[in-house]
Amino acid sequence: MSSLNLDDFSDLIERPDGGVRRDAEARRERQIVPPGSLGRLDDLGEWLAAAQSAVPVRPVERPRVVLFAGDHGVASLGVSARPAGSADQLVRAVLEGASPASILARRLNVPVRVVDMALDCEPDALPESVVRHRVRRGSGRIDVEDALTLEEAEAAFRAGVAVADEEADAGTDLVVLGDVSVGGTTAAAVLIAALCGTDASVVTGRGGLAIDDLAWMRKCAAVRDALRRARPVLGDQLQLLAAVGGADLAAMTGFLLQSAARKTPVILDGVVSAACALVGQRIAFRAPDWWLAGQNSGEPAQAKALDRMALEPLLNHGVTVGEGAGALLALPLVQAAAALAAELPEKPEELEAGEGPEAAEESSPEPENPEALAE
């Protein structure tokens, strides 16, 4: 039996400050550019002000990319275009600066943190800072067995909470959240199908590295079989993550919830982070107010999850590579929204009150005797 009480998060997590958001909206009304003319950037600036409890909004100066990594046993069925147990190679590419996410992060001057939760490699193959939270080597094959024991699921969840605390304590003011996994999209599809009450075929996508039709059918069958195992434990989110999630997904769920509790905004990347967010919403319904959907990855399960959480993706560029790359592309939009909200000047007071030059002209009294003046 787990000693973790997930219900505590419902009490710990508050919505972003509604009063501050109204103040931000009022300030926006006073600025020289008409309200609404900046599109979603207006909404983003007001959301960020509420998250920060600050008007004018502060710039996003210390963002961080946090990637949770793990291998999934279900990949051995040929449901991924990548070899089973090869996620450590992707992690090395990130650490060496050769992955799309690390290249983008370098360009945007954003540090990247990788957290190994269940990579299928020897722990000494990677730096201690990467592997210190590892729960196990690989996750179980979810179509026929649990991904984790309940104790492992709790340990992974608590690790995610600890990472969120470390980031908040270090002054990180926004997190770009992603995953580095092989087989992770299959587990994510199962979680989303279970929580949304949909069939396997509706949520099964092609994955980050697109698979062919035969692999898609194998993936769909794996999702269907895992879904049967998920339904009996739907009422217990930790049991659900143990049954059909994985150590990386359990950790991401804990990370998302604790980030919301610590009032750290998070940009979600693809279907894996969306699945963890959906589990988090089931635990604490106010938590999604602290998250942004960075992009539409094209995975049908992601669309289902975001719709359920009422999150609209900021970008739609078809980025399927994972590793937080799509969400990273949305970061400059958030930073731009903050800059515009904070730095656009306000209208002069006389113009706001309708007392500008034109108004003064209109209100000037007519001379009493124009003819006398003419003489």
UniProtKB/Swiss-Prot annotation:
Keyword presence, Ubl conjugation: no
Pathway where it operates: Nucleoside biosynthesis; alpha-ribazole biosynthesis; alpha-ribazole from 5,6-dimethylbenzimidazole: step 1/2
Reactions performed catalytically: 5,6-dimethylbenzimidazole + nicotinate beta-D-ribonucleotide = alpha-ribazole 5'-phosphate + nicotinate + H(+)
Keywords attached to this entry: Cobalamin biosynthesis, Glycosyltransferase, Transferase
EC category name: transferase
A Pfam family hit: DBI_PRT
Protein name: Nicotinate-nucleotide--dimethylbenzimidazole phosphoribosyltransferase
Organism classification: Bacteria, Bacillati, Actinomycetota, Actinomycetes, Kitasatosporales
